[in-house]
Amino acid sequence: MFWIALGVMIVTLISMACCGSVRRKAPMNFIFLALFTLAQSFLLGITSAKFRSNEVMLAVGITAAVCLGLTLFAFQSKWDFTVMGGVLFVAMIVLLLFGIIAIFFPGKTITIVYASGGALLFSIYLIYDTQMMMGGQHKYSISPEEYIFAALNLYLDIINIFMYILTIIGASRD
């Protein structure tokens, strides 16, 4: 069941990212979002089950506070984060490569460094995606008919922040 959920999540994510007709036209966009959400929630449940309940609740609280603070910052900030798409993409590739290297050097320290970098990167992505969704005076924005895709971006940012914070908390207890 895990592999089916992972496959559904990857296929729906790639379909929505690459196919404009899938992410712009109802009801297709709602169907893909629902499929993605179901698959992601199953995977998130499996992953969260590997941690203690108090650790998961602490991660939920920290994630909620971080996301609220970053969203308020994105609304109030004079800085335009929408021009940082290329830099964030390169940072994502660096994080991916660091994660692959970290597999061969397991340990508490490298796990915490990796998870901290991921939490920081997706925190910046949350600001970036929030400003992209807002449009207005920012240089770049997401068009209004792509509201499902914008919601998916925010959802992914928040889930990734949660997972990295949970990893930090889990690695800290060991």
Predicted regions and their residues:
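A hydrophobic alpha-helical transmembrane-helix feature that marks the membrane cores
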Residues: M1-D174
